[in-house]
């Protein structure tokens, strides 16, 4: 039996191991297509700013071809470095495309204000054909996407600081699209807006330079359909991370956006580890979980073997991503989702509608959290040096805070406050025969008010009121005089208050659709 278990562990380990490079050793290359990427031919800020302006307008052209759009986006993504050409050559290793770098310089002879740098040959016509587009023959204005603020005509600037801010604003909006472009492009608008608001509040971007929705949709669709563009973006992120020392501000912003990009499409695997295993609930000891725990262990080892590309396996369309799907460990995943829903409110919006979802193990996770609330793990307590007395104290505090948390989830309860209102009528009060009690007219429309004294109170009445009846106080029906002087004084004060209230109601105008609200503290005390 020991040899069987050893063989099983070895089998599980080798089953998920990626294939090793062997055999003929030749790399398989596909049929490549050429991508033209314009880069600045000098260090002038004017050249870069003008190139950025032309590229943004090119991307906003709805009729732009796919390879041309990819080249324009690669050029925009690399404009923040000192030598874009060297960066592109260093990080690009794509079997599907061949990148051709073209240096761009200023020119007064072209319509676009830019031309391709060449030795002895004029490339003005080629530059105009690349950077500009022809208007339709029918005379209609061609639709193009630009910034939401249509008053912005161009983004050409002369100073480096202004150029960096405009470039950072455009790059932030492009990089934010990568997080959801592959996994959930249809529901990405809300999360993208939250990221944009965050960087606007941090003054990393300029809010006035928010790109048009059509422009962003064009770029998002291109990122989703072009693997080569995603490979370049991932390679650029990894190159920035490897850079030692202080990084440019735009590079730091890209690394910050990368926190939303990494592990995209791997939520099932990551959350299963977080809620199913790291919580260390005793339910992991069930026999049903034994096989799936072994699967998770082998997948974690495989994840580490993939290195720095592992968090981007879904974005890079790596075929090994299917091994990390929740379908490989459905029971453990269902249990982990139940634990997560109970522990974190953000898990409530997760979509569980999958064929391998098991409701029984989902409820197991929920009940495990509920019944283990406030309990301290003995193994963890011994490692941390927690005594039994301290463990009991922690359990008591955890139970108290758990009850407080449950109370907060229902939301604050607002006390109902009512006011005296002048309604469209009153009602004659019935005679009262009880001692130390006087009945006042009850006004009913939407709010009901009770005025209390020490021995006198008003009764509520739910009968409809007629607008033709006036509110009156029947003095003859007041309670008989008490022999106690103090009680008589209180009775007199209460009667005065009731009469004052009745006079206010009688003086009001009937038929008013917007009744006034009285909140006189002296009358309501």
Swiss-Prot record:
Chain segments carrying region Ntail: 404-525
Protein name per the record: Nucleoprotein
Residue ranges, annotated region (Disordered): 402-490, 506-525
Biased composition (Polar residues): 408-432
Pfam families: Paramyxo_ncap
Keywords per UniProt: Capsid protein, Helical capsid protein, Host cytoplasm, Ribonucleoprotein, RNA-binding, Viral nucleoprotein, Virion
Region (Homomultimerization): 1-36, 373-391
Principal subcellular localization: virion
Keyword field contains RNA-binding: yes
Region (Interaction with the phosphoprotein): 477-505
Similarity annotation: Belongs to the paramyxoviruses nucleocapsid family.
InterPro entries: Paramyx_ncap (IPR002021)
Composition bias type Basic and acidic residues, residue spans: 433-464
Domain notes: Ncore is globular and carries regions required for N self-assembly and RNA-binding. Ntail is an intrinsically disordered monomeric domain in the C-terminus.
Subunit structure: Homomultimer; forms the nucleocapsid. Binds to viral genomic RNA. N0 interacts (via Ncore) with the phosphoprotein (via N-terminus); this interaction allows P to chaperon N0 to avoid N polymerization before encapsidation. Interacts as N-RNA template with the phosphoprotein (via C-terminus); this interaction positions the polymerase on the template. Interacts with the phosphoprotein; this interaction leads to the formation of membraneless organelles that function as viral replication factories.
Chain residue ranges for the region called Ncore: 1-403
């Amino acid at each position: 039996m020991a040899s069987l278990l050893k063989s099983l562990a070895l089998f599980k380990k080798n089953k998920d191991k990626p294939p090793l490079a062997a055999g003929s050793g030749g790399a398989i290359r596909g049929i490549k297509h050429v991508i033209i990427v314009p880069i600045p031919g000098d260090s002038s800020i004017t050249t870069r700013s003008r190139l950025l302006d032309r590229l943004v307008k090119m991307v906003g052209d709805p009729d732009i071809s796919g390879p041309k759009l990819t080249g324009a986006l690669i050029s925009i993504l690399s404009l923040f470095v000192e030598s874009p050409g060297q960066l592109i050559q260093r990080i690009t290793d794509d079997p599907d495309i061949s990148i051709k770098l073209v240096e761009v310089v200023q020119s007064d002879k072209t319509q676009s204000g830019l031309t391709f740098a060449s030795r002895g040959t004029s490339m003005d016509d080629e530059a105009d054909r690349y950077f500009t587009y022809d208007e339709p023959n029918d005379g209609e204005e061609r639709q193009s996407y630009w910034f939401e603020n249509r008053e912005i005509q161009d983004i050409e600037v002369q100073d480096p600081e202004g150029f960096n801010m405009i470039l950072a604003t455009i790059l932030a909006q492009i990089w934010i699209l990568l997080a959801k472009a592959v996994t959930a492009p249809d529901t990405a608008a809300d999360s993208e807006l939250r990221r944009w608001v965050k960087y606007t509040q941090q003054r990393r971007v300029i809010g006035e330079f928010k790109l048009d929705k059509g422009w962003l949709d064009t770029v998002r669709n291109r990122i989703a359909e072009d693997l080569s563009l995603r490979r370049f973006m991932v390679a650029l992120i990894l190159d920035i991370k490897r850079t030692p020392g202080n990084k440019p501000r735009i590079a730091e912003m890209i690394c910050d956006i990368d926190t939303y990009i990494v592990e995209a499409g791997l939520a099932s695997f990551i959350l299963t580890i977080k809620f199913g295993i790291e919580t260390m609930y005793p339910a992991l000891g069930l026999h049903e979980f034994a096989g799936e725990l072994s699967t998770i262990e082998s997948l974690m080892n495989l994840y580490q073997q993939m290195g720095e590309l592992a968090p981007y396996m879904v974005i890079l369309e790596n075929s090994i991503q299917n091994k990390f799907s929740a379908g490989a460990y459905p029971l453990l995943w269902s249990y982990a989702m139940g634990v997560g829903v109970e522990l974190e409110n953000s898990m409530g919006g997760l979509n569980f509608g999958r064929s391998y979802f098991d409701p029984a193990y989902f409820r197991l996770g929920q009940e495990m959290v509920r019944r283990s609330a406030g309990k301290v793990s003995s193994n963890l307590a011994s490692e941390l040096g927690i005594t039994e007395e301290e463990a009991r104290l922690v359990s008591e505090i955890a139970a108290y805070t758990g009850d407080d948390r449950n109370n907060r989830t229902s939301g604050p309860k607002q006390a109902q406050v009512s006011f005296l209102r002048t309604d469209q009528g009153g009602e004659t009060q019935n005679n009262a025969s009880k001692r130390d009690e006087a009945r006042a007219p009850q006004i009913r429309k939407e709010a009901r008010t009770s005025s209390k004294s020490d021995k006198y109170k008003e009764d509520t009445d739910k009968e409809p009121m007629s607008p033709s009846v006036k509110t009156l106080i029947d003095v003859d029906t007041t309670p008989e005089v008490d022999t106690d002087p103090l009680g008589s004084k209180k009775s007199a004060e209460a009667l005065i208050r009731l009469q004052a209230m009745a006079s206010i109601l009688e003086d009001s105008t009937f038929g008013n659709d917007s009744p006034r609200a009285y909140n006189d503290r002296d009358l309501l005390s």
